[in-house]
Amino acid sequence: MTQEKKKFDAEVGKILNLMIHSLYSNKEIFMRELISNASDACDKLRYLSQSNSELIAGDSNFKIIVKVDKDNGQIIIRDNGIGMNKEDLIENLGTIARSGTANFLKNLSGDSKKDNMLIGQFGVGFYSSFMVADKVTVTSRKAGESKVHTWESDGLGEYIVADSEQEFTRGTEIVLYIKKSETTFLDHFRLKHIVKSYSDHIAVPIYFCDEAGNNEIQLNSASALWTRPKSEITEDQYKEFYKSLSYAVDDPWVTLHNKNEGAIEFTNLLFIPSSKTFDLFHPDRKKRVKLYIKRVFISDENIDLIPSYLRFLRGVVDSEDLPLNISRESLQHNNVLEKIKNAITKRVLGELRKKKEELPEEYNKFWTNFGGALKEGLCEATTDHEKLLEVCIFRSALHNKMISIDEYIANFKEGQNTIYYLSGDNPDKLLSSPQIEGLLNKNIDVLLFTDTVDDFWVNVNSEYKGYAIKSATRSDIDVEQTTSQPKDKNTDSKKSDNEYKLLTDYFKEILGELVKEVKISKKLTLSPACLAVSDTAMDIRMERFLIEQKQIANASAKNLELNPKNKIIEKIFNDLKANNKNNNELVNLIFDQACILEGEPVADTGAFSKRLNDILQKAIL
């Protein structure tokens, strides 16, 4: 038997060291790489046999066999694919980053490229074996040839290639001599789990057998559901796949199975769960959409395949156009990935828009489960905010049901050009807020925002389809003129301020720095007073949230708006006109009440309690 000792290409030692110790963060993917290579070999031969059937004569059923020899510390992977001769072994295994598959693809043209599930884009996958093995031997016989050759290396810079006299059928056998520190990979259960996790949908059947080569058990389903036509898949099959993929107990609410053809080709099989996922808002949450390339699992981590706000999606995306980086664990940032992401996002939002219109009750349940996550996209600079807002729904204060902003606009009062909202923690409390009593009295609807994220997205989305989005806590809202045309607006606001200057000055004198300004309200109809902020100030709830998060130290002074039609305010005003200024405690109590209704802390709870007791005593006596 003749043999040759050769050195790897220049710098190969450094590259091997980098790859073994740094490039792969998950050692178990060595199995994925070797099985992928075996699958490539079978696909190559299947393609070539179309024009030369003699190549597979007597052995036309392609398969991959995995064995474990615990006594000798070996893992063996065997395929009956195209095999390699001596020159192939030197070219494909003796040179880092040279891929026989890549060269093979260059020789294909037309539709044959689509028909070959060839996944090796780089020549380093094989060398991931050295993460777990201190020696690797390869025995191979090329289809159509009679000679057998071996390749052997410890990964330290040299390899031996030799002729072999042993009897060997077509294909390749790889033997890994497992390191003592990695013997857990010799465990049958673990190895089976690895194969099923990464290679379940490889088209070539993968068998596991005992040391003697008996008792073959097929490990993979060898059938990627997403590659089959939708017309051939039943609803139960979709449900079964969803549950096995995501370990879910619920049924999917929506199934999206699409094949994208054109400049970029990919297939997606995506599911929207019917139940809320437990880790939706967990900081360590994992993405549940798996990336496959030609039916081989690549990753569900460190890939920007779907936007974060669609993280409730479950499923797979399979593409032939995605380039991989040299480790195949993380994708290069490129336009292809971005286009796939945009296409998926557009498809999902389109389906949600359809469900919102056709199945409003079911959509309400979906929104309860995932609306909070979906609205996070409104805070992202790269999101099409208008398209995303089209699928958002909010509780209507006027109708006490969930509606979209488009429905809100369709029900505008004549002359109305503003979308009003009020944010808070509890929708029932918001309904009784003095901030919206005047608007509701005029049949002007108000959207109730109850998620924390609402206070953030409205800061970057001040309008929708040309209509301003405004908080009902703003000081400049006039319910009498909010539906008037600009030409009809008059000077009532200034007249009211001047008329009640005695009243507002008195309140400001008593409250001092506790308030920024005291104004006559144009939106209150029943309550005596409320807090408000100017258009340029931070919303009250947003400020409170930032204080809780210690992002700002103290609350800013708010405006106090007074309702001159309220009996209490009217009495104070009449007393002032009679030169009676003995309502200081009542003024403070009105302010304290406004703070409480807005969820703001009372400046002095002891003084508040005393004032309340004094007024109650006077009322009794």
From Swiss-Prot:
Intracellular or extracellular location(s): Cytoplasm
Positions of disulphide bridges: none
Family annotation (NCBIfam families): PRK05218.1 (NF003555)
Region (B): 329-544
Classification via SMART domains: HATPase_c
Pfam family, one: HATPase_c_3
Gene Ontology CC terms, in alphabetical order: cytoplasm
Organism of origin: Rickettsia prowazekii (strain Madrid E)
Protein name: Chaperone protein HtpG
SUPFAM superfamilies the record matches: ATPase domain of HSP90 chaperone/DNA topoisomerase II/histidine kinase, HSP90 C-terminal domain, Ribosomal protein S5 domain 2-like
Segments of this protein annotated with the region C: 545-621
UniProt keyword terms in alphabetical order: ATP-binding, Chaperone, Cytoplasm, Nucleotide-binding, Stress response
Major place of residence: cytoplasm
